[in-house]
Amino acid sequence: MTDLTSFSAAELAGLVARGESSAVEVTQAHLDRISAVDDRVHAFLHVDTEGALDAARDVDSRRAAGEPLGPLAGVPVAVKDVLTTKGVPTTAGSKILADWRPPYDSTIVRRLRAAGTVMLGKTNMDEFAMGSSTEYSAFGPTHNPWDLSRIPGGSGGGSSAALAAYETPLSIGSDTGGSIRQPGAVTGTVGVKPTYGGTSRYGLVAFSSSLDTPGPCARTVLDAALLHEVIGGHDPLDSTSIPAPVPDVVAAARLGASGDLTGVRLGVVREFAGEGAEPGVLAAFHAAVETLTKLGAEVVEVSCPHFQYALPAYYLIAPSECSSNLARFDGVRFGLRVGDDGIRSLEEVMSATREAGFGPEVKRRVMLGTYALSSGYYDAYYGQAQKVRTLISRDFTTAFEQVDALISPTTPFVAFPVGARTADPYQMYLADLFTIPSNLYGGPGISVPCGLADGLPVGLQVMAPTMADDRMYRVAAALESVVGPFTPPAL
């Protein structure tokens, strides 16, 4: 049989359902692949071999008993190490949580288990999801399977690199300012940020609570849609969860795969027309626009004048919320504890713990956020940023009165060499230039491969109105039907 790691998730689910391959065989093939290549890629922080095989055996037993199986039963999935997994390490890429094993599953993980997917393990990430390259992980960087000397994007580079390395057919990420879509773009995979509130944040280690959004990652648009359908939907344990059904993203992906976009009106954001983007990225984007036009879409230019303020607004809102959220990591209740010698005061222990446990990027953002929220500065910084956020949301609302979806490059540049930007935080922050607006608005966004620049993947971003996730899946699948899924060089 063909190497099982080369199949899509939809194909693997079909093999298992028909009894042409067992879930154990599928799982073992991916575990073997991880053993063979992950010492070079470093996509995983923890591989739960026994747990994965036990879950696979359960699927095989249920099939043998004639029980109905879900659409992804027996399919392996990797989970970004920012979602709690009962009894399995959850570090958020930080030294401060290095030995923490949560006593409960996040809602996303619970739904994955209920659907019969097989969790392979936890993937590497920038510490507390703060970064754009997965170089800020306390456990070392992840490498891009397209070129191991380059970054896989961030913060969820591990989830996307694992897909590109064929270590898993599916993975879960979280997107606060582009942390699913940007890694997807630079690894040639599909990354989806659902509508905020469309996927549960219960059990997600919080970075910026008004922005954090868990979502699916895959190698094909249909696979991402199938995973989206499994993890999405209302959750009473999350106060920000939208009490509405998941849009019919699977049907939309299948419709788009026909390659017909007749009647679809797409908007190119004028303010994103080339600012800060590499020539190769722009060339791939313009070629994708031509392809979408040939598929029947009408492409027009729209203006979103406040998008230029999205990056500075984000870097006030997100650090402000993270400075509050990360206050819980103090060495008192769980995680790392430093200096508890019976002599130091509680305040000294807390300070020593945070000094030793947090990395430089986390400290930078906590300090920035604390300042922005401090007395006398709150209105000038955090308050003003929230007003800008409202203006950006109005830009989206106005734009979506004219078009069905917006398109742009996902990132301004292709994957850069490891270490090339760590000395300049601002250059690192520019990686999310095109993705941040949809986080501030709360609407969905997807990155789908659209071409190559200098032999490296380029992603097209499709943004849609809130709870219209199906629209972006249709457009992305249509482009994929022409461009096709990308295959990196052999490792």
Curated annotation (Swiss-Prot):
It catalyses: L-glutamyl-tRNA(Gln) + L-glutamine + ATP + H2O = L-glutaminyl-tRNA(Gln) + L-glutamate + ADP + phosphate + H(+). Pfam families: Amidase (PF01425). The keyword ATP-binding applies. Its EC number is 6.3.5.7. The active site is at K80, S155, S179. GO terms for molecular function: ATP binding; glutaminyl-tRNA synthase (glutamine-hydrolyzing) activity. Allows the formation of correctly charged Gln-tRNA(Gln) through the transamidation of misacylated Glu-tRNA(Gln) in organisms which lack glutaminyl-tRNA synthetase. The reaction takes place in the presence of glutamine and ATP through an activated gamma-phospho-Glu-tRNA(Gln). PANTHER family: GLUTAMYL-TRNA(GLN) AMIDOTRANSFERASE SUBUNIT A, TRANSAMIDASE. This is Glutamyl-tRNA(Gln) amidotransferase subunit A.
